[in-house]
């Protein structure tokens, strides 16, 4: 590189660095005007700034008036002429009235700036949330692959809240303080430039301390937040997958990880508290030291004036300067600046940092943007071939692990192409590349000869439909979910107004209220009727219309979040209907019928092949019987194409495909392949069984939704009302282990409260000592003595604040840590039914751990320390005032009820506002979280604009309601701020009257005045802190209710219950190890079991079920989707309890026994393979028996048996490879095999397999079966399966239909005598 180029590069580097510095310096200003503010926003911003600045002027004006009053009082004290008394009183009355006028102006200005900033902050938060949400909808899939679990939800909640807090009324408070600061210095220099100049040294001292203290505070706060975010992610995954956590009793392992992260946060939080404590102590030390300096220097000026007889420098003038630059800062800025402005700087910085992080995501230009509309670069030929030319691909999160390696393939237009192969061979990746969810690393994907990178993404996706391996539905009605497939259809653009205007939602609501679907359609117009007709036709094609017709609400039925209220098979049918409704030119099916039983699958497959005749169809499948009629079958292995051809050609070549077919062939004798007419009749009845089962399955899930609508039972709900006394009583055991630090904190807080009144005594005597009635030497002597007293108070204040803030911070972090750990434990101890009812979503439950845990600082942290100091000062000030001058004190205290009343109303209205605010935006938040969780589905269907419109509609009502509530709540805040000014006017008027009358001296008056002035200011501050206390009490009540549930509804076995009086410190410690159990199979019996979900007692999911499995048997459960098979597994795990009958394991009724320690002998592999964020080693180890930490050898053995060990060791980091949030860094087959390894590492006596190999190819499945046979010798195994070849060797197969066991026997026996079983088997056979 040449010298010139090096200089150029260095210059560019400096320029980039300068730009970053400028952007960082201006980020807060950019935040205020970000996201296209409207005229209303700009008006609110302008009003807020001007009113806040103007509100800083009245108090300095009062300083001038107070100085004049001091001169008046001095004159009255020195002059005993009674005739002059009335003249002095008249002057005092005039000035007191001016204080009233100034107070009224202050109240009006405060209300304007608080209301303006609050409303501005609320509107900015909504704009940012929408802008960030809109940017998320633009991002490509790779962006979300690298996003930790729950981060998007956290950004949309806590991060936006952080920004809102940093752009609301706190900005006005700081502007008010800065305005006061500037105005005070201007007046001070005008009044006495010399003394003002001497006190300028305060400013750099404050700035230096704030900068250094702020650096360390921010450093520790960032470390704390990082660890809290990590712990929240662990909790979110655990709450979202409560079934797995319960089944493996994995509470302790996840709790250990959760507590470890919180432990790090606790250490950082304590260091942050110490940093803030030092900062607070130094601020008061500087202020009181400056007070002493000012009075000492001021006394010299006054003494010189008295000695020279020069009236130019009066006590009032000196008092004005000292009051504005020192005392005013103590009583005004330092009360609202030390305790508020300094922390506010951190709040603003946090808002700026958070905004910068959000802005980076918002401004991120996605490589694939599916939101751009227009006809430019549209797909010209929609009937051309799809080709992959030398395509290589690796996921951005793992660039060193290629998924596709130089792949070339062609999918002919108008034909059916099938892609098969081993798990992890890249089949689903091909589908993602064709739909342009990702772009290839090398090579190109072309559609009709056009590179799809050159095409408009929406245009490309408008001509295809993708049904993914794990279908995702939105929390809407069946009607709306299917109609979503029409959103970006080029042939149905005329239907857009009806699709996007909310009409379908209104129709679905009407149907749920008993109205007829077609009548409602006609009412809403021809376009709507056309949409509904197309939806019904698509449902027919997807074999979904029958089960939809059986539902009470039909097409108006809500499917729940992510389709949680319907079965997997029903979700797949609705997803297929959604993809077929627009009759796409290209249909991509990625294991689209894997969750269906064979009969349903056969019908759906036939319907798809019929409707896609002459169109392009790409199928990805592991069930090879579903693709044997394909025009071309492409076989993949390890990211490469190994062979292709028709089914017969590939069988003839006897290659990899033929081997897979042989592995899946069922053992059916040739003579049994001829199906009689009676068999076909039986097939019809079998179809009826399927539909009944589907209806029952949906009923059981909808029962959970019904339960949610009923609301929580106060006797068993975390939101139950709790009395204040019982809440306070429960705080005692929490604080008991920390009594030493609590004693230090309380003692220090008492000292802080006492020093305020002590400073009033010193101040009053100082004013009296500097009276011009005294000699110059006496004034100088008083200045030195009382200056020293202020310095002593400064030292006391430093150590008292240091002790109070650090000790209360230490206690707060300890309590927060324990409460969060115990809350997590209590949540995970509740049974599955509790988690799935009463609207207890993982997000809602997580808020107890995060928001409620954090809110407790209002009862244990610096907030409560400040309030205690204020209350102590209140008592001392009132007592001192009555002792010194009770006549003055009584009148001044007359306004206290008004102040307290305003403060109480402020707390009440603010609490109500916060509760309504949280409820108002629940729906909109739910939309954003759901969209992020279903982002691939939204991208594939081009739903970004529709989702954004739905989000905006959800905000209209809440935004107006919140604005009205905010205006009312802020009125009381302004009153609580402004009422203290009227105390000043009353105090000076009445005090002057008493001094002129000779009842009290000037010293007595100023002691009472300063004591009550400080109290008045502190009371105002206490009311600003009161919402924190209110939030803390609400949060504590919820937490205590939750901990109470831990002792009443616990199903998690031998952990110590949280009984009253138990040591919470001990409760938060890790649990004791459980003893290992003996090996060998165990018996399982279900005796006349009936089961209904409590909210739907009239719907029997299981109806008199009898099953008996001997120790060591391999038992299988088969039957149509929704027949109750998975419910049986849930009952065996005691995730639910039977309505009647009993479940016996090893001869013991598990419903009658206490605890669930029997689960130690059971391992469970769910249908949906769930992994947690963490390493492969961590995830497999979660399956170990509680209290046992598996060795590396045990983990590797389990992985070998699950046929995943070789895959793991080929990864760059081996067993230390991070699985990613919800295991998103692994393929479906890899996740499933790890889930099996997790079960096998337990070495259970009973192994439960629920469709545990549905995501595996035939070869992987065969190897896994061999491993399972080896691992489960002597073990009892219960397997649920749709693929009958996986359970051919079962000792006994139970045929479950309509909640009953209709037959049992071996595979050969059931093929011989059960027509429904034989038909199912024939559908899966090749020959």
Swiss-Prot record:
The lineage of its organism: Eukaryota, Fungi, Dikarya, Ascomycota, Pezizomycotina. Induction: Expression is induced during iron deprivation. Its main location: membrane. It is a multi-pass membrane protein. Belongs to the ABC transporter superfamily. ABCB family. Multidrug resistance exporter (TC 3.A.1.201) subfamily. One of its GO terms (biological process) is oligopeptide export from mitochondrion. Residues 1054-1081 are annotated as: Disordered. One of its GO terms (cellular component) is mitochondrial inner membrane. The gene is ABC1. This is ABC transporter 1. ABC transporter; part of the gene cluster that mediates the biosynthesis of hydroxamate-containing siderophores that play a critical role in virulence via intracellular iron acquisition during macrophage infection. Probably involved in the excretion of the extracellular siderophores. Residues 47-326, 743-1031 form the ABC transmembrane type-1 domain. Signal peptide: none annotated. ATP binds at residues 421-428, 1119-1126.
């Amino acid at each position: 590189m040449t010298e010139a180029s090096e200089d150029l590069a260095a210059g560019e580097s400096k320029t980039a660095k300068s730009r970053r510095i400028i952007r960082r310096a201006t980020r807060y200003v950019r935040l205020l005007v970000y996201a296209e503010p409207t005229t209303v926003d700009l008006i609110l911003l302008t009003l807020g700034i001007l009113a806040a600045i103007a509100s800083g002027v009245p108090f300095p004006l009062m300083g001038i008036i107070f100085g004049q009053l001091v001169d008046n009082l001095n004159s009255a004290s020195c002059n005993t002429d009674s005739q002059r008394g009335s003249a002095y009183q008249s002057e005092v009355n005039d000035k007191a009235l001016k204080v009233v006028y100034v107070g009224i102006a202050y109240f009006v200005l405060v209300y304007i700036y608080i209301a303006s900033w609050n409303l501005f902050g609320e509107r900015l938060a909504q704009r940012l949330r929408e802008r960030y949400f809109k940017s998320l909808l633009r991002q490509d899939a790779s962006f979300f692959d690298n996003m930790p679990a729950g981060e998007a939800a956290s950004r949309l909640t806590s991060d936006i809240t952080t920004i809102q807090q940093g752009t609301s009324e706190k900005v006005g408070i700081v502007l008010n303080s800065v305005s006061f600061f500037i105005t005070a210095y201007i007046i001070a220099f005008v009044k006495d430039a010399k003394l003002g100049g001497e006190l300028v040294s305060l400013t750099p001292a404050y700035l230096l301390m704030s900068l250094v203290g702020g650096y360390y505070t921010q450093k520790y706060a960032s470390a704390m937040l990082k660890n809290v975010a990590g712990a929240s992610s662990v909790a979110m995954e655990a709450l979202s997958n409560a079934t797995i956590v319960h089944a493996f009793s994995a509470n302790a392992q996840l709790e250990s990880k959760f507590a470890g992260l919180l432990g790090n946060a606790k250490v950082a939080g304590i260091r942050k508290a110490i940093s803030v404590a030092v900062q607070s102590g130094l601020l008061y030390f500087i202020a009181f030291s400056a007070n002493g300096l000012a009075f000492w220097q001021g006394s010299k000026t006054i003494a010189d004036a008295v000695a020279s007889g020069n009236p130019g420098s009066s006590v009032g003038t000196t008092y004005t300067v000292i009051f504005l630059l020192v005392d005013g800062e103590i009583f005004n800025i330092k009360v609202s600046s030390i305790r508020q402005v300094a922390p506010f700087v951190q709040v603003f910085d946090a808002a700026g940092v958070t905004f910068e992080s959000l802005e980076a995501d918002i401004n991120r230009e996605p490589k694939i943007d599916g939101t751009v509309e227009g006809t430019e670069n549209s797909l010209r030929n929609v009937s051309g071939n799809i080709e992959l030319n030398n395509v290589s691909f690796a996921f951005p999160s793992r660039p060193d692990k290629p998924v596709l390696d130089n792949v070339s393939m062609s999918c002919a237009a108008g034909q059916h192409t099938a892609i098969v192969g081993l798990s992890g061979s890249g089949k689903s990746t091909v589908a993602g590349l064709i739909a342009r969810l990702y772009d290839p690393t090398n090579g190109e994907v072309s559609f009709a000869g056009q590179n799809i990178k050159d095409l408009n993404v929406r245009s490309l996706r408008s001509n295809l439909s993708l049904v993914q391996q794990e279908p995702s539905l939105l929390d809407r009605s069946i009607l709306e979910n299917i109609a979503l497939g029409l959103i970006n259809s080029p042939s149905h653009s005329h239907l857009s107004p009806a699709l996007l205007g909310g009409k379908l939602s209104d129709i679905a609501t009407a149907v749920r209220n008993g109205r007829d679907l077609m009548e409602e359609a006609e009412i809403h117009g021809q376009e709507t009727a056309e949409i509904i007709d197309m939806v019904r036709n698509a449902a027919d094609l997807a074999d979904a219309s029958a089960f939809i017709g059986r539902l009470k609400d039909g097409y108006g039925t809500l499917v729940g979040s992510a389709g949680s209220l319907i079965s997997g098979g029903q979700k797949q049918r609705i997803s297929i209907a959604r993809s077929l409704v627009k009759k796409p030119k290209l249909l991509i099916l990625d294991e689209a019928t894997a969750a269906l039983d064979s009969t349903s699958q056969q019908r759906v497959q036939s319907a798809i092949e019929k409707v896609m005749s002459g169109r392009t169809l790409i199928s990805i499948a592991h069930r090879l019987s579903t693709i044997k009629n394909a025009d071309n079958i492409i076989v993949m292995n390890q990211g490469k194409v190994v062979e292709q051809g028709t089914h017969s050609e590939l069988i003839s070549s006897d290659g990899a495909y033929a081997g897979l077919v042989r592995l899946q062939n069922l053992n059916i004798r040739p003579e049994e392949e001829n199906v009689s007419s009676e068999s076909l009749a039986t097939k019809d009845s079998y179809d009826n069984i399927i539909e009944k089962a589907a209806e029952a399955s949906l009923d059981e899930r909808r029962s959970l939704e019904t339960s949610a609508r009923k609301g929580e039972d106060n006797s068993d709900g975390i939101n139950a009302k709790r009395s204040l006394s019982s809440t306070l009583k429960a705080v005692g055991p929490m604080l008991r282990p920390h009594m030493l630090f609590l004693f230090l904190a309380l003692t220090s807080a008492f000292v802080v409260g006492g020093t305020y009144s002590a400073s009033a005594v010193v101040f009053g005597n100082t004013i009296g000592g500097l009276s011009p009635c005294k000699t110059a030497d006496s004034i100088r002597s008083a200045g030195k003595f009382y200056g020293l007293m202020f310095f002593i108070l400064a030292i006391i204040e430093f150590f008292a604040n240091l002790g109070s803030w650090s000790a209360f911070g230490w206690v707060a972090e300890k309590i927060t840590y324990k409460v969060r750990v115990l809350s997590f434990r209590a949540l995970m101890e509740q049974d599955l039914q509790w988690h799935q009812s009463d609207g207890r979503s993982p997000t809602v439950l997580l808020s107890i751990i995060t928001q409620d845990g954090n809110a407790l600082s209002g009862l244990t942290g610096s907030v409560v320390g400040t309030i205690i100091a204020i209350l102590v000062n209140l008592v001392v000030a009132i007592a001192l005032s009555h002792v010194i001058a009770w006549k003055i004190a009584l009148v001044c205290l007359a306004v206290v009820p008004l102040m307290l009343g305003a403060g109480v109303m402020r707390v009440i209205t603010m609490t109500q506002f916060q509760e309504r605010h949280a409820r108002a935006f629940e729906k909109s938040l739910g939309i954003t979280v759901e969209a992020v969780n279903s982002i691939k589905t939204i991208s594939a269907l081009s739903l970004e604009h529709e989702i954004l419109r739905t989000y905006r509609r959800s905000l209209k009502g809440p935004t107006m309601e919140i604005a009205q509530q905010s205006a009312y709540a802020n009125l009381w805040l302004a009153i609580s701020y402004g009422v203290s000014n009227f105390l000043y006017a009353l105090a000076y008027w009445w005090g002057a009257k008493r001094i002129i009358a000779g009842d009290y001296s000037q010293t007595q008056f100023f002691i009472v005045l300063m004591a009550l002035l400080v109290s008045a200011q502190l009371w105002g501050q206490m009311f600003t802190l009161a919402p924190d206390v209110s939030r803390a009490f609400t949060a504590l009540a919820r937490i205590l209710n939750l901990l109470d549930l831990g002792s009443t509804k616990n199903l998690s076995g031998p952990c110590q219950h949280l009984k009253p009086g138990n040591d919470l410190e001990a409760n938060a410690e890790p649990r004791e190890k459980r003893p290992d159990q003996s090996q060998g199979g165990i018996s399982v019996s279900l005796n006349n079991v009936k089961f209904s979900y409590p909210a739907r007692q009239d719907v029997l999911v299981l109806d008199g079920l009898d099953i008996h499995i001997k120790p060591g048997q391999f038992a299988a459960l088969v039957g149509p989707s929704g027949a109750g098979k998975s419910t049986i597994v849930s009952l065996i795990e005691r995730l639910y309890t039977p309505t009647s009958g009993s479940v016996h394991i090893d001869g013991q009724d598990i419903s009658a026994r206490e605890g669930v320690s029997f689960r130690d002998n059971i391992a469970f592999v769910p249908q949906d393979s769930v992994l947690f964020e963490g390493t492969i080693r961590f995830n497999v180890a979660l399956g170990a028996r509680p209290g046992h930490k598996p060795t590396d050898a045990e983990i590797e053995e389990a992985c070998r048996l699950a046929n995943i060990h070789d895959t793991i060791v080929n990864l760059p980091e081996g067993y230390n490879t991070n699985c990613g949030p919800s295991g998103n860094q692994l393929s479906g087959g890899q996740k499933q095999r790890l889930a099996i390894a997790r079960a096998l590492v337990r070495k259970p006596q009973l192994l439960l397999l629920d469709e545990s190999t549905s995501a595996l190819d035939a070869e992987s499945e065969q190897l896994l079966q061999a491993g399972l046979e080896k691992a489960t010798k002597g073990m009892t195994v219960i397997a649920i399966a749709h693929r009958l070849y996986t359970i051919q060797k079962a000792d006994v197969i139970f045929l479950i239909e309509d909640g009953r066991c209709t037959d049992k026997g071996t595979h050969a026996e059931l093929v011989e005598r059960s027509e429904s079983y034989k038909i199912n088997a024939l559908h899966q056979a090749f020959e």
